[in-house]
């Protein structure tokens, strides 16, 4: 029996306040579910602006506890109501002064399954993330959801192939890459890195990028969200480069086995030969 997962991504622009951003994403989750979506991922730091264009402690106020905070709780209820797996990229507070760039994963019955904390934190013009986030400490977890084995790899993480591979070794079938990435800096990489990672690791990737220029800086977020399959092929069209868009795509999960039987990368990999990768 064939296995197909209908998956959704939302790329959107900053609305001006946290509550309206949360409302927009909840509405989009309902729209996606109405189209049959079984799993959905939001963009990086989904309920806020991309405040890392500046270094301002006022934005620490965007932090919430996960899963005890109100946004996780709210979307647990949404997930249960809709029967949809939700991936929620947020700004996590552990305690005052200790914050992470995190994605919570909620199963289709509303159960909180766990979190992924962004491992690689940039600190360059327009992306002053070390001011806000501590590097992740939770490894590369895989979440056993109603639609299969889901992983998360956030934005700047995507430039580091080691994490993509760790997610594959840990059993990922779909990996979501919620991002906030700017046209002038990385657009030439956007359609190269994730397809290459999907091929090398033989799973689906959902890549999400916000859209628009926000009041905090010159970063021009270019959308162009997409799903890519284990053969490196885009699943349907990519998202618009300038406008908010909800993407809903059917993922043929049987293709994963076909590709892994064709290219036995997991059989042929050589962990014993990779010691150099752990050296500074």
Regions found by a protein language model. Name each.
Residues 102, 115-117, 177, 237-238, ...:
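Residue-level detector of high-confidence beta-strand sites
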Residues 254-280:
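A conserved C-terminal secondary-structure "cap"
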Residues 18, 26-109, 115, 181-201:
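Cys-nucleophile CN-hydrolase/nitrilase-fold catalytic domain and related Cys-dependent amidase chemistry
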Residues 1-38, 176:
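N-terminal active-site segment of His-dependent metallophosphoesterases
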Residues 67-87, 149, 155-245:
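CN hydrolase (nitrilase-like) catalytic-core segments centered on the catalytic cysteine
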Residues 7, 105-113, 228-236, 240:
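Short, glycine-anchored, charge-dense loop/turn motifs used at functional sites
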Residues 64-67, 77, 94-173, 183-196, ...:
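Active-site catalytic loop in hydrolytic enzyme cores
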Residues 88-90, 102-105, 141, 225-227, ...:
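Short beta-strand scaffold segments in enzyme catalytic cores
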